[in-house]
């Protein structure tokens, strides 16, 4: 995964689709549709890759 990729949080489906903003070490900053900006510990949570719905 890298900045710009779309992901979902496996235990927070209500957060919606997120886009990775930055990755510094194991800290991943993701901007989620319904939760805003969240910093995830990549050592604890394995984000699930996804794609935005076609328009």
Predicted regions mapped to residue ranges:
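Intrinsically disordered, low-complexity, charged/polar segments
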Residues: 36-55
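Residue-level detector of flexible, active-site-proximal loop/helix-junction positions
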Residues: 14, 27
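Short coil-to-beta transition motif at edge beta-strands of beta-rich domains
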Residues: 1-12
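SH3/SH3-like beta-barrel fold
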Residues: 28-32
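Glycine-centered tight beta-turn/hairpin loop motif at sheet-sheet or coil-to-beta transitions
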Residues: 13, 33-35
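A short, compositionally biased
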Residues: 1-3, 23-26
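Short beta-strand-centered aromatic/proline hotspots
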Residues: 16-23
């Amino acid at each position: 995964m890298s900045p710009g990729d779309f992901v979902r949080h496996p235990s927070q489906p209500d957060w919606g689709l997120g886009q990775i903003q930055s990755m510094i070490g194991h800290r991943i900053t993701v901007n989620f549709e319904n939760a805003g900006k969240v910093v995830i510990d990549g050592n604890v949570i394995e984000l699930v890759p996804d794609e935005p719905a076609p328009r």
